[in-house]
């Protein structure tokens, strides 16, 4: 089988040329609270200051990895799609495909949405990881990616909240084995969407828990995904737990492990442990007001990748906390996501706002 051609990581500015404008029909501004927003997005639990190791300078880390503005036209287009709220632009509301994926004796499903132009031809695929159980129906996030020409997949791997037992299926000592679902999902998606011998490019992305999954997919299972973008993610769990508060350390003991008692397990499930395996480009975006991430750990992770000549970037956004759900935050982040994946996959950046929803 042939795989779609690779793009040099040194040429991100020369590919994925922007071909778009604001959506053709004016719409009202997006509501202050968007579909799916958390009620506690502004609580002290998720808003504060990102962690830094003793001796590191928060100011220097922000200077080294500054906020960069995405393309203004793209951001405006995404804001228009968000404000439309599915009134006119509703590709994501079309019937979904539930793809069964086997990983040994474990079977999980992958919910897939396919844009109209990709029903017969090879298109890039994005796997979005989250704790939530995938659901059909309109949502602005898949709408963004579908209209940019991506097949959008949501693997319900062990740990997603599709049932109480399934949500706990990657807790503690189960996580090392459960993470192999990431590799299995990549195999299933490539097999399903190979067209006439052309294997699709496959990206991985997610926030928080999904961001951690993204980094594990790009490190421990290097080669399974062609590019990854992780937001609000942890790169080194043992280091993070040593920096955070005792309360959060206790709260995460069941999910990750205890730093003293389970040091080997934490090492095994940390992306930093497997960083030397990385083959594809990785981007990280963290908020300077996010108490659930370590800027120092992310900086060390990216520097190690760059020392190996890898395409790796980190952006620290001063205004962002852990949950970025305001319309302007959503448009900013997703503009960067689209620019990243189109440039690394060598496809034009076109966002289709025309025709029936």
Predicted regions, residues:
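Acidic catalytic loop of the alpha/beta-hydrolase fold
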Residues: 289-293
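Mobile cap/lid helix-loop segments that gate and shape the active-site cleft of serine hydrolases
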Residues: 226-227, 233-274, 280
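Short beta-strand/loop motif that positions the catalytic acidic residue
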Residues: 278, 284-286
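Non-catalytic accessory segments flanking enzyme active sites
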Residues: 44-116, 137-147, 191
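C-terminal motif of bacterial Sec signal peptides marking the signal peptidase cleavage site
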Residues: 21-22
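Cap/lid segment of the alpha/beta-hydrolase catalytic domain
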Residues: 97, 119-194, 199-201, 207, ...
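C-terminal catalytic histidine-bearing segment of alpha/beta-hydrolase fold enzymes
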Residues: 299, 306-357
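Primarily recognizes the serine-hydrolase "nucleophile elbow" in alpha/beta-hydrolase
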Residues: 187-194, 198-242
């Amino acid at each position: 089988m042939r795989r779609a051609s690779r793009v040099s990581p040194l040429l991100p500015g020369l590919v994925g040329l922007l071909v778009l404008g604001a959506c053709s029909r004016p719409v009202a501004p997006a509501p202050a609270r968007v579909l799916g927003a958390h009620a506690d997005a502004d609580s002290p639990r998720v808003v504060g200051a990102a962690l830094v190791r003793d001796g590191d300078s928060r100011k220097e880390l922000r200077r080294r990895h500054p906020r960069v503005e995405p393309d203004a036209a793209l951001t405006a287009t995404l804001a228009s799609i968000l404000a439309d709220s599915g009134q006119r632009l509703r590709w994501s509301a079309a019937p979904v495909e539930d793809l069964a994926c086997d990983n040994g004796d474990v079977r999980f499903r992958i919910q897939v949405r396919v844009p109209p132009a990709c029903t017969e031809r090879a298109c890039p695929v994005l796997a979005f990881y989250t704790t939530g159980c995938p659901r059909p129906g309109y949502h602005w996030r898949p709408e963004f990616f579908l209209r940019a020409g991506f097949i959008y997949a949501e693997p319900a791997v062990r740990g997603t909240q599709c049932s109480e037992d399934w949500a706990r299926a990657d807790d503690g000592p189960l996580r090392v084995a459960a993470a192999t679902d990431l590799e299995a999902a990549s195999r299933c998606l490539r097999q399903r969407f190979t067209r006439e011998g052309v294997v699709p490019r496959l990206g991985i992305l997610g926030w928080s828990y999904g961001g951690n999954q993204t980094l594990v997919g790009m490190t421990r299972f290097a080669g399974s995904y062609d590019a990854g973008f992780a937001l609000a993610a942890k790169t080194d769990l043992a280091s993070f737990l040593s920096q955070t508060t005792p309360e959060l350390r206790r709260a995460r003991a069941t999910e990750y492990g205890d730093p003293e008692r389970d040091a080997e397990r934490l090492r095994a499930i940390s992306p930093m442990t497997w960083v030397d395996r990385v083959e594809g480009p990785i981007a990280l975006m963290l908020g300077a007001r996010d108490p659930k991430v370590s800027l120092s750990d992310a900086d060390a992770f990216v520097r190690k990748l760059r020392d190996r000549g890898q395409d790796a970037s980190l952006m620290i956004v001063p205004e962002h906390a852990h949950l970025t759900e305001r319309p302007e935050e959503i448009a900013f982040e997703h503009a960067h996501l689209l620019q990243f994946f189109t440039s690394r996959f060598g496809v034009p950046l076109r966002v289709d706002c025309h025709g029936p929803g």
